[in-house]
């Protein structure tokens, strides 16, 4: 008995030592900045709220829900042909999520070491990062100091229907991102209400504003994402103990009365819904594996041509209603086809609302990283009319194990 106890103590000590001995290698573009003591305090507040966000994300993954005893239960297909129902899985059963959790634990165990890879991105060179509005900028001294260009100015200059949607989202960003409820699955409020320095200081990207293949003008102007941790985020860790870090964690905002067309990508992805819907069917989404027999697949040189026919209201059985309690967590396997649809029900009458989520990917250092949009079967002229009920084609590409 004593030997078993001693063995357990030694094993525990070794495990603790392994965590404490973690070696962090930052990305090459993370450089020490010469800042004053007062400026460092602003960065420290940004870092402190970032750690809360990452810790809460990890805790939400590992807290049992549904039929899972060791982790959260995630929807991996909103419609499975064999059952006619959604398909779920315990999220920590995926190896990529195990590694993501392992790396987050290393960061949280030794935040001072990990902090060496944290960059407020005040002078980021890769691409322009924005703050939604002056109102959001004024939420924290850190955001004011970083002084990013404003998305309200960006969309004012753009004009037209895209600019109008962008202004609607960003002028009302605080109201939209405050329509959240984190009581069911979080022990801290991870929304802009609980972490104002983080949400106002992280750099926001108008992902589809200048992409003519991305659907309606209102959607193109009404979608933003931000990356806190990952290759293009604030916390840019390349390796921990020689192991590639695939974690890419941030947040997304989609304006109400929009439809994010079918799309797919190589990296696995998770979403945790924060928005409390104002009606049951305010925010719908779907995820189905590319090889689902609901679709038609034809082999191509580098992948598969997947034809989706959601006409005659077939699409409705594929979609589920998102909420902050039950349908709150989803996991997309590689090349899973998914969409976010906020056009039904009260979307025609509400104001200052949308879909706000904690967003993450788990394999940011392998295969192709960019999101691939599906295309209308009718040709380029149908792009602005893309909806789940239209015939769509996805040119899915092979990925390397």
From Swiss-Prot:
Residues 1-21 form the signal peptide. It is an enzyme of class 4 (lyase). One of its GO terms (cellular component) is periplasmic space. Its main location: periplasm. InterPro entries: DimsulpropLyDddY (IPR054994), DMSP_lyase (IPR031723), RmlC-like_jellyroll (IPR014710). It comes from the Bacteria. Disruption phenotype: Cells are unable to produce dimethyl sulfide (DMS) from dimethylsulfoniopropionate (DMSP). Cells however grow normally on DMSP as sole carbon source. Its EC number is 4.4.1.3. Keywords: Lyase, Periplasm, Signal. It is found in: Periplasm. PROSITE patterns: PROKAR_LIPOPROTEIN (PS51257). One of its GO terms (molecular function) is dimethylpropiothetin dethiomethylase activity. It catalyses: S,S-dimethyl-beta-propiothetin = acrylate + dimethyl sulfide + H(+). Catalyzes the cleavage of dimethylsulfoniopropionate (DMSP) into dimethyl sulfide (DMS) and acrylate. DMS is the principal form by which sulfur is transported from oceans to the atmosphere. Belongs to the DMSP lyase DddY family. This is Dimethylsulfoniopropionate lyase DddY. It comes from Alcaligenes faecalis. The gene is dddY.
